[in-house]
Amino acid sequence: MADPRNAGPGDGRLYRMPTAFGPALGPRQAPAGMCHDPAASPRKSCAYAAWRTDAGLLGELLPPGFALRGEAVVVFEFSYMTDIAWLAGRGYNMLTVRIPATYRHGDASVDGYFQPVVWENLTEPILSGREELGWAKIYADLPAATHKHDEIVCRAEWMGFRFLELRLGARAAGGGALQSGPVLHRKYIPATQHWGQADVDYVTLTPGGGSQARLLESATAQRCALRIARPRWEDMPTQHAIVGALADLPLLECVRAGTYQTVGGKDLSDQVRLG
């Protein structure tokens, strides 16, 4: 007799590998009898900077069907999250890269932010985000931000190689949170055996509304410095092309930078498949 824990995909519950042990718990599926309050979780502290850059180089990061929207700007944001309900109060950190873009599919178009890559420092959100949502998540070491005098410093590293550092200073109260959506992603899963082909290749959308996040405080930075170190293959064997492409972008002008703190959010179960 089959074990009911392993009824498998198609029974209305969320599964991820390994499937032999029953439905997968995570941000969009809690243990039986438990529910998470989106108004109370997570607590998030963010630091961001938006830079004007070269339109030609930035456009090379967009998939087919996408075009730059407005001025050529690339946004880097560090998020430090704690008190996450689905992790039983634990947390993790994240670095996102976003590009204002328009996606056209058929006769429709969507204005939003294309997110070519996301770094996180914990396995669980990486797997659930890649497989369920189509977010392009990969791993990096993202230590806690450091504060010295009036400056905040955020760093991203991979096995000892520091590939990105953001410094913000001379902050003045106010400015609000960074606009959070809609966010567009290209979900891609390669085919087994048929190497070079895809089992999945389509665009997904994270809607901008529906979050119960409340802004606690915010500040605008008057000083902003971003350093992207170009890695050799030996430094980042599987990610050097990713970081190298970002390092190619000239940082012409910081058009906006700041910090903010929020509490609450949403589980992203409103994610939409396009195409």
Q: At which residue positions do the language-model features occur?
A:
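Short, structured protein-protein interaction patches enriched in aromatics and acidic/basic residues
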Residues: L68-T102
